[in-house]
UniProtKB/Swiss-Prot annotation:
Record-stated family: Belongs to the TDA11 family.
Cytoplasm listed as a keyword: yes
Keyword flag Phosphoprotein: yes
Disruption phenotype: Leads to cell death when overexpressing the camptothecin mimetic TOP1-T(722)A mutant.
Miscellaneous comment text of the record: Present with 504 molecules/cell in log phase SD medium.
Organism: Saccharomyces cerevisiae (strain ATCC 204508 / S288c) (Baker's yeast)
Pfam families in the record: TDA11 (PF17084)
GO cellular component: cytoplasm
Compartments it resides in: Cytoplasm
Protein name as it appears in the record: Topoisomerase I damage affected protein 11
Region: Disordered, residue numbers: 32-62, 252-306, 332-377, 400-504
Main localisation: cytoplasm
Residues with Phosphothreonine modification: 236
Amino acid composition bias (Basic residues), ranges on this chain: 470-479
Length: 504
């Protein structure tokens, strides 16, 4: 039961009125005493206009708001006190009004009837008012019949409620399907929009990549142009670029003489050329700050040229002088195939020793010029004079004998001087052995003219008592003297070494 049925039952209890079911209609006249037999509800049908069905399935008659008062004689339930009392209605004006009010609140549901029940309905002569309700009718129903009819109507009501539930669920399912279809359509549209956006972005990226490659190519061309303007050596061929500016600043004479040799200066200049080429290549490819780096490199190149060009040129000239002097001394002019004789204790610097080693590798490739021979002789005379002056100053400051590790002077390039060299070595070696001086066995010492004269005067004034000490001192000091051409021998020819002096 729902709330509406509970409300109706509570009102019926308060008013002491039963409006549950009316299955039979009996027409009665108020004057007639002998009443008809009441027909059972099972044999009689019911009129569709007289009934309504609640949601629970029970049949109720429409309740009168203003029931009429009946007399004791006219009351139909006097004979059967156990029967339920039903209100009799006379024709009055208030009945249609009450029915209209009740119908406005309750919408009756029509229960389908079978043809058999319609045929069983008796033809009742009565006068019908509005809404098909008889004006004079009385219904009597026993409690058992009312209960049976209530059960049957409840079953019909339950089946109708199930049908109504099915009818209500079908449209809801339809609404859900339409919503699903709508959401599906929206999702498809979103996917299409996403695909379109992806395609647009791909096209945009391709366009940007093309612009990037084009701008990179333009930038590379501009870099090449700037590098050509800043470094003119890049415009020259690769063969000409292989020569460094250091090698270009060397005099032409020395370059032509060293053309056929894999010489030390060439080996020094090649790494510099390679470094110069690599720096040029890196500068041409450098991505940023090209002008600043070019200016720095140009300034560094100019500083390198100023630092290294002159020393290397002097080194090459000095190398040539030493080479020709050694050739002249060792008589390579006569026999170029002979092995050179190593001089004992020649005082040369690191550059001179490396140059001599380099010259010994390819002696046949050298050529001699008369002008360079004169220059070399003048240079050697100047060097020997400087050495003699330095040794004279040291001996004047110190009275004791100071042995200096010096090397032999360079002799003339004739056979006679070679023979003199061998004889001088033998005499000096014998004197050194007699005097006991081991340092003079392998070393030659220079002597100056002033010291030579002083030693001669001192030796003449010494007595024979000094003996061995005097001879030792004489041999030591005489070994440090230099005798020049044109001076008297003074009986010491074995210790004199002639030094050639020529004017520049």
């Amino acid at each position: 039961m729902n709330k509406f049925d509970e409300f109706i039952e509570s009102n019926e209890k308060d008013l002491d009125v039963d409006t549950s079911t009316r299955n039979s209609i009996i027409s009665m006249s108020p004057v007639r005493k002998t009443g008809r037999k009441i027909r059972s509800a099972s044999s009689n049908g019911y009129r569709l206009e007289h009934h309504r069905t609640s949601s629970a399935g029970s049949m109720h008659s429409q309740r009168l708001m203003t029931p009429t008062r009946l007399n004791d004689q006219d009351h139909p339930l006097q004979a059967k006190p156990d029967a339920r009392r039903v209100v009799t209605r006379h024709s009055s004006v208030s009945v249609p009004n009450a029915m209209s009010k009740r119908r406005s609140l309750i919408q009756p549901m029509v229960v389908p009837t079978t043809p058999e029940s319609q045929n069983n309905l008796p033809s009742v002569s009565h006068s019908e008012g509005s809404y098909g309700i008889p004006l004079e009718s009385t219904t009597v129903l026993s409690s058992e019949q009312a209960m049976a009819s209530g059960l049957r109507r409840s079953r019909n009501g339950s089946s109708q409620s199930v049908n109504s539930m099915i009818a209500t669920t079908i449209p809801t399912n339809g609404v859900d399907v339409s919503a699903l279809l709508q959401s599906l359509a929206t999702k498809e549209l979103e996917l299409l929009e996403c695909k379109q956006k992806i395609e647009d972005l791909k096209k945009q990226t391709q366009h940007e990549e093309q612009n990037y490659t084009r701008r990179a190519r333009e930038l590379h061309e501009l870099k090449e142009q700037v590098s050509k303007h800043l470094d003119p050596s890049l415009n020259t061929p690769v063969k000409n670029r292989a020569f460094s500016p250091v090698y270009q600043n060397i005099p032409l004479e020395s370059r032509t003489e060293n053309a056929g040799n894999s010489s030390l200066p060439s080996s020094v200049s090649k790494p510099k050329n390679m470094g110069h080429q690599s720096t040029n290549q890196s500068r041409s490819v450098s991505p940023q700050d090209i002008q600043e780096r070019r200016q720095r490199d140009d300034s560094s190149d100019s500083s390198k040229q100023s630092l290294w060009s002159k020393p290397l040129a002097l080194f090459n000239q000095f190398d040539k002088i030493i080479q020709h002097e050694i050739e002249r001394t060792l008589n390579w002019d006569d026999s170029l195939s002979g092995t050179p004789e190593v001089q004992e204790g020649t005082p040369t610097s690191n550059s001179e020793s490396s140059a001599q080693q380099y010259d010994n590798e390819a002696p046949g490739a050298r050529q001699k010029s008369p002008s360079q021979g004169s220059v070399s002789r003048s240079l050697w005379s100047f060097v020997s004079d400087v050495k003699a002056g330095l040794l004279g100053i040291e001996e004047e400051n110190d009275n004791d004998v100071i042995t200096d590790n010096r090397c032999d002077p360079v002799y003339k390039s004739d056979r006679q001087h070679e023979q003199k060299k061998s004889t001088h070595k033998i005499t000096n070696r014998g004197q050194a052995e007699d005097s006991g001086d081991d340092s003079s066995l392998n070393m030659r010492k220079f002597k100056t003219t002033t010291k030579f004269q002083k030693d001669n005067a001192g030796n003449n004034s010494l007595t024979d008592e000094s003996g061995h000490r005097t001879r030792e001192k004489k041999s030591k000091r005489s070994s440090n003297k230099l005798s020049f051409i044109g001076e008297p021998d003074n009986d010491n020819s074995s210790v004199k070494n002639s030094v050639e002096m020529t004017d520049f």
